[in-house]
Curated annotation (Swiss-Prot):
Residues 124-220 form the VPS28 C-terminal domain. Component of the ESCRT-I complex (endosomal sorting complex required for transport I) which consists of TSG101, VPS28, a VPS37 protein (VPS37A to -D) and MVB12A or MVB12B in a 1:1:1:1 stoichiometry. Interacts with TSG101, VPS37B, VPS37C, MVB12A and MVB12B. Component of an ESCRT-I complex (endosomal sorting complex required for transport I) which consists of TSG101, VPS28, VPS37A and UBAP1 in a 1:1:1:1 stoichiometry. Interacts with VPS36; the interaction mediates the association with the ESCRT-II complex. Interacts with SNF8 and VPS25. Interacts with CEP55. Residues 13-120 form the VPS28 N-terminal domain. This is Vacuolar protein sorting-associated protein 28 homolog. SUPFAM superfamilies: Endosomal sorting complex assembly domain, VPS28 C-terminal domain-like. It is found in: Cell membrane; Late endosome membrane. GO terms for biological process: negative regulation of protein ubiquitination; protein transport to vacuole involved in ubiquitin-dependent protein catabolic process via the multivesicular body sorting pathway; ubiquitin-dependent protein catabolic process via the multivesicular body sorting pathway.
Length: 221
């Protein structure tokens, strides 16, 4: 019945147009790819923070778990935004408008720069939890960035130890305290300009990561 009727262009086999099978790239070079990767990371952090806020409101996470998770996300947000901030993106509000990111709860946390569980007094348990999480991440990030001089590591490590001491809920034999104490002893035997060698950095990262995981297990117990 339809014999002899030619196929309408665009209505038939896409095999006649090999360009339809070509990968569409958002970037033209490595620099552009890194830019989009950085924006995607920031987008993901904000969305995750929004989800965490909703979970806390619905009592799906405990206050301690929420405080630790939110504190980590705030640290990650600051690092991610620094990678994106520039002539195209000057503020997080501008980023959210540009990419239609509707996360009001996350934006409130970002602007207050602290979990909702934290009050202003330094003795508050949630304040201590947030500080411990932030200090663990800060020290580990410094080591990963090859910042390894004694006078650049010891102050944060000492503050981490002091903050853990203020947490009366932590058991006296908590392994994180012992780990930090041992490294403080190592650093105390060094001069200000001395640097940790590669082996020490690797071991310290392993020890602090283990201590940080132990701290999170304690919060979930």
């Amino acid at each position: 019945m339809f014999h002899g009727i030619p196929a309408t262009p665009g209505m038939g086999a896409p095999g006649n147009k090999p360009e339809l099978y070509e990968e569409v790239k958002l970037y033209k070079n490595a620099r552009e790819r890194e830019k989009y990767d950085n924006m995607a990371e920031l987008f993901a952090v904000v969305k995750t923070m929004q989800a965490l806020e909703k979970a806390y409101i619905k009592d799906c996470v405990t206050p301690n778990e929420y405080t630790a998770a939110c504190s980590r996300l705030l640290v990650q947000y600051k690092a991610a935004f620094r990678q994106v901030q520039g002539s195209e993106i000057s503020s997080i509000d501008e980023f959210c408008r540009k990419f239609r990111l509707d996360c009001p709860l996350a934006m409130e946390r970002i602007k207050e720069d602290r979990p909702i569980t934290i009050k202003d007094d330094k003795g508050n348990l949630n304040r201590c939890i947030a500080d411990v999480v932030s200090l663990f991440i800060t020290v580990m990030d410094k080591l990963r960035l090859e910042i390894r001089a004694m006078d650049e590591i010891q102050p944060d490590l000492r503050e981490l130890m002091e903050t853990m001491h203020r947490m009366s809920h932590l058991p006296p034999d908590f392994e994180g305290r012992q780990t930090v104490s041992q490294w403080l002893q190592t650093l105390s035997g060094m001069s200000a300009s001395d640097e940790l060698d590669d082996s020490q950095v690797r071991q310290m990262l392993f020890d602090l990561e283990s201590a940080y995981n132990a701290f999170n297990r304690f919060l979930h117990a």
